[in-house]
Amino acid sequence: MSVLRWIVPALLCLALVACGPPKKSVFPPTVTVQQLTVLPGGQWQLTVRIQNNSYSSMDFSVLEGSMQVAELMPIRLHASFTRDIPAFAGDVIQLDVLPTAAMTQTLQAVAAKGSRGSLAYRIGGSARAQPEQEDTPRDFDFSGRDWLSPVPGMPGTFR
């Protein structure tokens, strides 16, 4: 009988613990340049895609990083914004950056090749986000490499 006095309360406690909400896994986002547009003043407008790879929505607020084009000196990326991105979904932000003269020349050389041209880039940094089940935001590191190519019929646009 004394064993039952221990087993019943222990089973009730375990049942209550099991009733809590399941913890959703959180993973770093993927950040890529979806489009680069050369503006009339020589600035570049980047359309940056943030892909939430987590099982819960995340509130993104800051992007800090750098972008390196064709092994040239990297340029700083910084943006403050508000985006609530659902689980396994993505959204875009716009960033205006001022490229170096060498970056501009490299991009012009790629544009001159037309659809045969492509430009390697590397992006890295951190994105600040608050996962759905957490009380405070935290920084998630990201890094990636990809290529940009001229878009036929859209001068000054690369994807």
Question: What do these predicted ranges mean?
Answer:
Residues A70-T106:
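Intrinsically disordered, low-complexity Pro/Gly/Ser/Thr-rich segments with frequent PxxP/GP/PP motifs
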Residues T30, Q45-R49, E64-S66, T82, ...:
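Beta-strand secondary-structure signal
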Residues A15-A18:
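C-terminal motif of bacterial Sec signal peptides marking the signal peptidase cleavage site
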Residues M1-V8:
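Bacterial N-terminal signal peptides that target proteins for export
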Residues G20-K23:
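Bacterial signal peptide processing site
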Residues T30-Q34, L46, L77-F81, T106-A111:
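Short structured motifs
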Residues A101-T157:
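Terminal connector regions
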